[in-house]
Amino acid sequence: MVSCWDTAVLPCALLGCLLLTGYCSGSKLKGPELSLKGTQHVMQAGQTLFLKCRGEAAHSWSLPTTVSQEDKKLSVTRSACGRNNRQFCSTLTLNMAQANHTGLYSCRYLPKSTSKEKKMESAIYIFVSDAGSPFIEMHSDIPKLVHMTEGRELIIPCRVTSPNITVTLKKFPFDALTPDGQRIAWDSRRGFIIANATYKEIGLLTCEATVNGHLYQTSYLTHRQTNTILDVQISPPSPVRFLRGQTLVLNCTVTTDLNTRVQMSWNYPGKATKRASIRQRIDQSNPHSNVFHSVLKINNVESRDKGLYTCRVKSGSSFRTFNTSVHVYEKGFISVKHRKQQVQETIAGKRSHRLSMKVKAFPSPEVVWLKDGVPATEKSARYSVHGYSLIIKDVTAEDAGDYTILLGIKQSKLFRNLTATLIVNVKPQIYEKSVSSLPSPPLYPLGSRQVLTCTVYGIPQPTIKWLWHPCHYNHSKERNDFCFGSEESFILDSSSNIGNRIEGITQRMMVIEGTNKTVSTLVVADSRTPGSYSCKAFNKIGTVERDIRFYVTDVPNGFHVSLEKIPTEGEDLKLSCVVSKFLYRDITWILLRTVNNRTMHHSISKQKMATTQDYSITLNLVIKNVSLEDSGTYACRARNIYTGEEILRKTEVLVRDLEAPLLLQNLSDHEVSISGSTTLDCQARGVPAPQITWFKNNHKIQQEPGIILGPGNSTLFIERVTEEDEGVYRCRATNQKGVVESSAYLTVQGTSDKSNLELITLTCTCVAATLFWLLLTLFIRKLKRSSSEVKTDYLSIIMDPDEVPLDEQCERLPYDASKWEFARERLKLGKSLGRGAFGKVVQASAFGIKKSPTCRTVAVKMLKEGATASEYKALMTELKILTHIGHHLNVVNLLGACTKQGGPLMVIVEYCKYGNLSNYLKSKRDFFCLNKDAALHMEPKKEKLEPDLEQDQKPRLDSVSSSESFTSSGFQEDKSVSDVEGGEDYSEISKQPLTMEDLISYSFQVARGMEFLSSRKCIHRDLAARNILLSENNVVKICDFGLARDIYKNPDYVRRGDTRLPLKWMAPESIFDKVYSTKSDVWSYGVLLWEIFSLGGSPYPGVQMDEDFCSRLKEGMRMRTPEYATPEIYQIMLDCWHKDPKERPRFAELVEKLGDLLQANVQQDGKDYIPLNAILTRNSGFTYSVPTFSEDFFKDGFTDPKFHSGSSDDVRYVNAFKFMSLERIKTFEELSPNATSMFEDYHLDTSSLLTSPLLKRFTWTETKPKASMKIDLRITSKSKEAGLSDLPGPSFCFSSCGHIRPVRQEDEDDPELGKESCCSPPPDYNSVVLYSSPPA
């Protein structure tokens, strides 16, 4: 209420300090004195107030708040006074005082010039009485706001201008607050004082005073003040990002109660330098709260402006802060990552699913979500974008797919995208369960074949199981023998014998209504046992089950009414009602209508008790001695157990009246020839039906041979009539009403001799016809057997059909899925490698096959698209054969198979890197040396291959195997199978020279493989070098032994009118007699040896494949020794080519012989392959050489040897065995000149066409030189082939360096030539060699 007015007294205070140094130094002072004594003074308005203050120190005046210091009516004068002018005096003059000048006036020492212990001020309250203004402040129109706090003192400041005025306090509208001196008190200086304010004082309060008959009022509005801060927020929300140079604006918003006031301030990194401008405002538009805003703004933000910004809010004792983080970037950026995994899963039916990414970007990019390449929000209204997330509402299976988020900041030209895959898992749903609406279960006829189907949809694909629940019977009266389900259940499979006999359980994928669904079918072979089948489908989301009540019935439609026969008056009426006991109960007979059409509807008391059988309940109705009145409509009534409905089955019963017998036609006399036949008819009617009896000559006729009685005895048939059959025949018809008869005489004509002749003729005819049909049947069977044998004999693999035909054997072979089945998900298919008769071979990567933890490259054989059932069966048969054969190192082995439903049939086999042996040997002709020593000194030389051969050198899979190519599959590549790309592997092995021990090793391994196949009773039938594959470590494997293919359907073997056969490799008995056996494979093995030791040469070079070739082969002609075969090897070939199959060696004997050639005294310890690296080296103590032979030896049938050694003394054998002396062998080189033409069959490696003599003769016209040897062919008296056979072959010998080079004929006299040992490559059977000089 007072204010200090001290500006004018400052000079006086300084002067006082100079004069009265003692007082200013802090000596004791008296308080100031006022000229008016007492605590108050009353004066009239318009008078002048003089108030003087005297003190010992400088002082100032404090005025009422209603008095302004700038008021012109107010003045203060100061002077020195007292004794020696040592005191300070000041006079306050107020001219023309008014009511608002009422208040407390005080004189107060200045703080610096007084002692704190003394009284510092003197005050007096001045009332300026004004009858027209009893209140100092008048608030009659607009109440003045008075803040209050509940529980504290409340002052209503209605101060008056005179202490004698009486004032009353009223609260709107009608309450009066009377002072009681305790809670409510009146003070003319302060107003009304309420000691402990409550919510009752809240409102409009009015002070009233009556002066001179006039009522004066002043109003106050109490306001309850609070300190409630409801909320503090900073926008934009944290973190706040800006680019350098932008304007930072932060808005701190405080929400409070209506009666709350706040103080707001900021703390931020640039506060010390006042980087920000701050402005505040209040929003009172909300009737329930106040909203205060404090806006901080920084222009051109810099890196130094980043940091923590804090908004501080204070209201009374309440204090709140809110922080936000500000980041300042030099340029924009976008970073997006998967929040979880790239593949997300959800469940169909979920209310919503959120697809979100971890996005860090500035400034905020534009966001677009795509589903399968289409904007998601356009695709469905269920999709909505929130921030960087896509919300999918009411998830369905159609929501599965690829979702891509597109982020773009155009001004920064920044764009990013990221794709996530959403898998919507669906709980299994059974289609039949949703569409089935039958009120009661169906019934299945006894003994019938039933097919139960369960169509299931779910993601992932559900597993379906069939269960059987046997019946548990309830023998209560209400539900007699009713079958109800039990908790006992049995899982079924195709071999289950629980309940009904199961024919099979199949499962397949079908597209139904555009959706892939799994259809499982249970086939019940014989319906006999009632119970319940359950189809249970489950996946990781859930399980669903469909119960199929399987009620067997022996009653048609489960309800049948039958009448035993139409009753006749006096007989018994028998009605039978049979119902299924699983569907009906409460069976009774009722009579619905009588014969006179009188409607009845009552039960029949004559019905018997119902009887229960295995499947039905029978209720019989028997009425004895029926009369015509018993006719009517009878009905059997039964109640359906499931629906409660009463079912009626009606039958009409008409009781017939008795009627005497009546013959429709009388018998008549007639004649019949002996040995003939005759028929007598006796048709009669009556009620009941008459019984007919036949008599001959009054003797009753019984049925016997030659005499046949027809139905109801109404017809008498006599066969082969004899003389004894002549006589009187009589028929009698009888029933309860009477008897009727008719008779006739039968006359027999002719004698018995004629009859015997006819009988003999008939017998002979029957015997002749029987013999004819027997011969015809045998002939047809022979034709069928021949056709079957031809078809069976040409299967690539033949399992000795000693007792059972091949097709039946293959059908009986088992397939062990637990051993061979491989998951398709762990198989990654690659490129196609080839196609066969009914299938194709593709390259694949298999993880974990044969329990390996690594990835292995394999070959997969599968059917072509659109394969037939027979082709599927053929491939399945091949798979069974491969599983039956088993594993061996020297065969291409089966690794696994994929046979389960839901995908194609796949057969997984090994692959071999280096292709077939034939092409490999051809490529090694320039790299061949006899032993390892020469090979170690051979200089590397790049092979020069023929263009067509180069193509063959690429690693490939022949028939069932393939080359490997690395395919990234996410697995570790199996180093034992594949170290590098196939081409690199071949380039490495191509640099290695080929030695004699390699050739023997190949021969030995093939023999071991064939020994294994023969032990498994398998016949290869097409053993050749092209069907031998080369794998790692010089291991060879036999292939093409497991393909169950019919060569008549193979384009490589079949031509209409001609028959393609691999004649060069076939044994004579196979060519002429179509007989295939292990011995015929031995013959083919001999041809294979010839291929190996000619380094891939074509068998029978220069020989035309025609009928003449076959004839000479049958006569004993054989191939000459190949270029690099020793006598021991050639002897083995001749043994394999023995004319008598029984004299040919077994494969076990061949293994032993070749093993002896490989290594002396080797203990094999069960190994399938003998390592050869340490054999035939210098350090082994053996020097492998081919012995020289005398000229006489070659005169005995051998051509010039290709092996010579420098000294015969150095020749030794490696575990050589003693051969029988070679007999004179005719070879195809001795053919007449007209029989052959030079090199015309060199290209026919795989098969030859056996045709008529008009077969074209193939010639090879390429003349590319292979070597520098040139010998002029000038012999005209011999054929080209004979000329070649008489030429001395190029020398082949050992050298220290191992080089191979041709020998020029003109250098034979060179003395230096003998010192340098050298060798020449074998002839290339794919090109013509020209000789420039005649033979010596």
From Swiss-Prot:
Regions that span the bilayer: 759-780
Membrane topology (Cytoplasmic): 781-1336
PROSITE patterns in UniProt? IG_LIKE, PROTEIN_KINASE_ATP, PROTEIN_KINASE_DOM, PROTEIN_KINASE_TYR, RECEPTOR_TYR_KIN_III
UniProt feature, compositional bias: Basic and acidic residues: 941-957
What is the regulatory mechanism acting on its activity?
Present in an inactive conformation in the absence of bound ligand. Binding of VEGFA, VEGFB or PGF leads to dimerization and activation by autophosphorylation on tyrosine residues.
Q: Where are the Extracellular topological domains? A: 23-758
The reaction(s) annotated as catalysed by this protein in its Swiss-Prot or TrEMBL entry are: L-tyrosyl-[protein] + ATP = O-phospho-L-tyrosyl-[protein] + ADP + H(+)
Alphabetically, the GO molecular function entries are:
ATP binding; growth factor binding; identical protein binding; placental growth factor receptor activity; transmembrane receptor protein tyrosine kinase activity; vascular endothelial growth factor receptor activity
List residues binding ATP. Answer: 833-841, 861
Q: What positions are modified (Phosphotyrosine)?
A: 914, 1053, 1169, 1213, 1242, 1325, 1331
Highest taxon, organism lineage: Eukaryota
Disulfide connectivity for this sequence is 53-107, 158-207, 252-311, 454-535, 577-636, 682-731
- Active site located where? 1022 (proton acceptor)
Q: Which InterPro entries match?
A: Ig-like_dom, Ig-like_dom_sf, Ig-like_fold, Ig_I-set, Ig_sub, Ig_sub2, Kinase-like_dom_sf, Prot_kinase_dom
Where is the secretion signal located?
1-22
Q: Does the keyword Cell membrane apply?
A: yes
List, as start-end ranges, the regions of compositional bias called Low complexity. Answer: 959-969
> Subcellular location, in the record's words?
Cell membrane; Endosome
Q: How is it modified after translation?
A: N-glycosylated. Ubiquitinated after VEGFA-mediated autophosphorylation, leading to proteolytic degradation.
Where do the record's region annotations for Disordered lie?
941-982, 1304-1326
State the top-level EC class. Answer: transferase
Pinpoint the Ig-like C2-type domain residues: 32-121, 151-214, 230-327, 335-421, 429-549, 556-655, 661-747
One GO biological process term = positive regulation of phosphatidylinositol 3-kinase/protein kinase B signal transduction
Family under the similarity heading: Belongs to the protein kinase superfamily. Tyr protein kinase family. CSF-1/PDGF receptor subfamily.
Q: What is this protein called?
A: Vascular endothelial growth factor receptor 1
